[in-house]
């Protein structure tokens, strides 16, 4: 299922440096173009959430300006980290950097993929081979990795975490984790996982979301532990589709919760909670509002793969809901391309 043709150049949308800036203290994503705009657009809700004094607001302004500067430097700094890691880091479990083998994958996942590429495969038959977490929300679960592979990957991630190598934040909300492309795991692990296994599966589950046109991804591991990140606020992903796999370790709490699609006015009415099962992956639409409940005890590590289809996002950026203003970027960027493949309709509200 690999994409054939010349290498493609990927971009991000310019809104990355202005929109969806997360303020954890107030549990709010904001668009930031300056002090007056921030006061005008968010003054009442900020005051209702505790930003009441002049000092509070000035502290918020400083944090937002710092975050914008961080995002502006992100591509260059990420490339520098990746180069240093490639030249200087010594893995503890070098076998996880080998090309993805079937032995790393759960038998159920291999069976689901084998069915997905069979001539007579259809959605009804596929759903008999998956756990449907929510038919209404189109959330599914399937074992992805074997227990030995999860353990080996975790050991490698912990070894890297404890090394003196530079580390980038996994995303704009989490502070602890690992960017897999910086560690050198995109080419051997994540790209084959997307191309060979996830694309045929997603093509049947989510054809209206570009499931059959996935051409890039962003993969990272997030870590939750006492004294570090404990929970994750409600958000939606910069992705058409998402795979979230629990890697371990031993923990309590931290369940995922899901609302509706972010465009819906009652998107967080009666959220659905989903417990983690080590080795199993939860599949959902990127636009599905979700978060993570507070960790109780232990450490929780999850692999998150944002799956992207330029045929969808080239016409509408999911983060600013406008036609993307393209900016050249490193690697897969945020999944946009300057060339125009045939587009598909974005996910409908269901």
From Swiss-Prot:
Enzyme Commission number: 1.14.11.-
Keyword check for Ion transport: no
Alphabetical UniProt keywords: Dioxygenase, Iron, Metal-binding, Oxidoreductase, Vitamin C
Class of this enzyme: oxidoreductase
Span of domain Fe2OG dioxygenase: 215-309
InterPro entries named among the record's database cross-references: Oxoglu/Fe-dep_dioxygenase_dom, Pro_4_hyd_alph
GO molecular function: dioxygenase activity; iron ion binding; L-ascorbic acid binding; oxidoreductase activity, acting on paired donors, with incorporation or reduction of molecular oxygen
Cofactor: Fe(2+); L-ascorbate
Residue positions binding 2-oxoglutarate: 300
Superkingdom assignment: Eukaryota
Cofactor: binding details: Binds 1 Fe(2+) ion per subunit.
Binding-site list for Fe cation: 235, 237, 290
Family stated for the protein in its record: Belongs to the OGFOD2 family.
PANTHER family the UniProt entry points to: 2-OXOGLUTARATE AND IRON-DEPENDENT OXYGENASE DOMAIN-CONTAINING PROTEIN 2
Record's protein name: 2-oxoglutarate and iron-dependent oxygenase domain-containing protein 2
Species this protein is from: Homo sapiens (Human)
């Amino acid at each position: 299922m690999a994409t054939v043709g010349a290498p493609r150049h990927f971009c991000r949308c310019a809104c990355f440096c202005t929109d969806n800036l997360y303020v954890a203290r107030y549990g709010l994503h904001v668009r930031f173009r300056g002090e007056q705009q921030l006061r005008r657009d968010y003054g009442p809700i900020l005051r209702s959430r505790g930003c009441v004094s002049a000092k509070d607001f000035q502290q918020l302004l400083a944090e937002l300006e710092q975050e914008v500067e961080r995002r502006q430097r992100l591509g260059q700094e990420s490339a520098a980290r990746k180069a240093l890691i490639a030249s200087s880091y010594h893995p503890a479990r070098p076998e996880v950097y080998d090309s993805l083998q079937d032995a790393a994958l759960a038998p159920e996942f291999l069976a689901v993929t084998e069915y997905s590429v069979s001539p007579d495969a259809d959605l009804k038959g596929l759903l008999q081979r998956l756990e449907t977490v929510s038919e209404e929300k189109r959330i599914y679960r399937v074992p992805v990795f074997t227990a030995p592979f999860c353990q080996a990957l975790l050991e490698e991630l912990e070894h890297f975490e404890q090394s003196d190598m530079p580390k980038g934040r996994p995303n704009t909300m989490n502070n602890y984790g690992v960017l897999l492309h910086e560690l050198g795991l995109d080419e051997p692990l994540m790209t084959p996982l997307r191309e060979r296994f996830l694309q045929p599966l997603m093509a049947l589950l989510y054809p209206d979301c570009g499931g059959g046109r996935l051409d890039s991804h962003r993969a990272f591991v997030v870590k939750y532990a006492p004294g570090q990140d404990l929970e994750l606020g409600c958000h939606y992903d910069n992705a058409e589709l998402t795979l979230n796999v629990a890697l371990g370790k031993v923990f309590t709490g931290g369940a995922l919760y899901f609302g509706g699609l972010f465009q819906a006015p009652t998107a967080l009415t009666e959220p659905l909670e989903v417990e983690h099962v080590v080795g199993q992956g939860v599949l959902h639409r990127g636009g599905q509002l979700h978060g993570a409940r507070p960790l109780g005890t232990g450490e929780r590590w999850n692999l998150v793969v944002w799956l992207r289809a330029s045929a969808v996002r080239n016409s509408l950026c999911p983060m600013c809901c406008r036609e993307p203003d393209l900016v050249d970027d490193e690697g897969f960027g945020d999944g946009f391309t300057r060339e125009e493949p045939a587009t598909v309709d974005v996910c409908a509200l269901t």
